[in-house]
Amino acid sequence: MEMPTSDGSLSEGLISYLIRERGSAPQCAPEKHLSRLKQDVANTKMELKATLKEAQLASCSVELLLPLFKNTVEGISLENANLSASSLKKIFEQNDILSKELDTFNRVKLALEHLIKQTDYEQIGDSLLCLLKDLSDNESENRNLEEKVLEKETYIRELSCLFQNEKESALKANRLSQSVKVVHDRLQRQIQKREAENEKLKEHVQSLETQIAKWNLQVKMNKQEAVAIKEASRQKAVALKKASKVYRQRLRHFTGDIERLASQVRDQEAKLSETVSASSDWKSQFEKIAIEKTELEVQIETMKKQIANLLEDLRKMETHGKNSCEEILRKLHSLEDENEALNIENVKLKGTLDALKDEVASVENELVELQEVEKRQKTLVEGYRTQVQKLQEAAEMVKSRCKNLLHENNLIITNKNKKLEKMRGQVESNLKQVEQARSSFTSAEQRLQECQEKLQRCKEKCAEQALTIRELQGQVDGNQSLLTKLSLEEENHLIQLKCENLKEKLEQMDAENKELEKKLADQEECLKHSDLELKEKAAEYTALSRQLEAALEEGRQKVSEEVEKMSSRERALQIKILDLEAELRKKNEEQNQLVDKMNTKTQHQAICLKEIQHSLEKSETRNESIKNYLQFLQISYVTMFR
């Protein structure tokens, strides 16, 4: 039901589009032709409306008949009985009505197709005639415009040739001025680089001085700590000697008392033998002996208590010795940490040496760049000479000035070459000094490695001593039951021997520390010597930089004079170039206007063609949609009657 309305609106849209399209092109179609087209379009519109109304009526009747036909068929299928005469009549009547309506649909379809084809052919013919006229007119206009464009292009080419010739002369002058400016900028950059390198060297020297001061303070602190350790070890050794003497005296007293008691026991045993022989006197003397025995047992218990106290004192001394050994080990660990810090600082110094090497390499690269710049300057000078020979007829005064400038440049180049040779000699001497400093640093590193090995050996010795002390402690703990049987003098003698061995080892450590101090002092002297050499080199660099600045100032003055002369010429050339550019802009604007006109016409033609194609596509789609709709209706009727 919606198809006719949509077709009507689309036909109206096509009519309005054709009217607008033909109204927008008054040059192609006259007013009479437009009025005829309007009448034809109105007639076709009326015919299309009539056919569309017929199609609407047919579709409405079909819609009304289809549900009735469905109901009858469903009623017959539901009753499941034989068909009666009335039902057959109804079916035949509905079949006749549907066949009539299908015939009307076919007639409407044929009429619509015929009308659509007629309207399409008429529209396409009219549009083609108009387009052919437009194309002929546009071709004639395009030919005229192409002729004008060719004339303008020839004129523009002549102007561009003149402009390029003047541009080349201006570029030559600019190149001369730019080469002088480039040399000036490079010299300024080299001076700035040298100043930055000098500042870096000063900062590096200051950092080295601060590091040397820190090392001196650390060495002093290490010396003070070593002296304190020595004094503490001496005091501990004296205290151990005194304690050993006191223990020896006590042991002697105890041994004397034990011998006396043993003699007394022997005497009493002899007396007991006599009492056994004399049984008569046994009872009387037994009480006396029992009393004396109790007294002796009391004395033995007191002696045992004294021995236990002595053993506790020995244990305390052993613990004190252990603590002292642990303190010594801690101090050794601290010394090892300090040595590691010194190694780290040596690594940092190596890094600074590598940085100095890189700086020397950069200086060498700069020298190579300067040589390349000299070669380029020589090539430029040769090019300038050839240009001067070509321009001798036009500028004899300029030739004389250029010769003078070339002579001055050659003198400056020779002076620079001499200075560069001096700088090379100085750099080579500096490299030799750096290699000597490297060798001194390598020797110092070897010495430090030897010191580290010695410290490791001392650590191993201390560990062995700690193991021996632990073994002695285990022996003391295991042999507590045998202390009464063994002699304490031998143990004291062994302790004294161990104390003497420890003293000898401490003396060896003191000697090694003194050697390390001497090595550190030698390294400090080497560093001071290297600092003095660096200061001397910095002074030499400053003097050379001053000389270079003086030479550069002279060159700058000469360059400024040449730049002023070249600037006056450049201004005159720029004025001419601006005039030519203004003329070119005007001509380019005219050409652009012509091109825009051509483009607008071509775009208008393309738009018209696209719109016509679009309208044709729409009409084709409508025809296809109508055909599909009719086919759908036919298929639906066929399926229903089957």
From Swiss-Prot:
Sections of the chain in a coiled coil: 31-58, 128-226, 254-603
Keywords in alphabetical order, please. Answer: Cell projection, Cilium biogenesis/degradation, Coiled coil, Cytoplasm, Cytoskeleton
Where in the cell is the protein located?
Cytoplasm, Cytoskeleton, Microtubule organizing center, Centrosome; Cytoplasm, Cytoskeleton, Microtubule organizing center, Centrosome, Centriole; Cytoplasm, Cytoskeleton, Microtubule organizing center, Centrosome, Centriolar satellite; Cytoplasm, Cytoskeleton, Cilium basal body
Against Gene3D superfamilies, the record matches this protein to:
1.10.287.1490
A GO BP term here is: negative regulation of cilium assembly
Mind naming one GO cellular-component term on file for this protein? centriole
**Tagged with keyword Cytoplasm:** yes
The Swiss-Prot or TrEMBL record describes its family as follows:
Belongs to the ODF2 family.
Q: What does this protein do?
A: Acts as a suppressor of ciliogenesis, specifically, the initiation of ciliogenesis.
- According to UniProt, the name of this protein is Protein BCAP
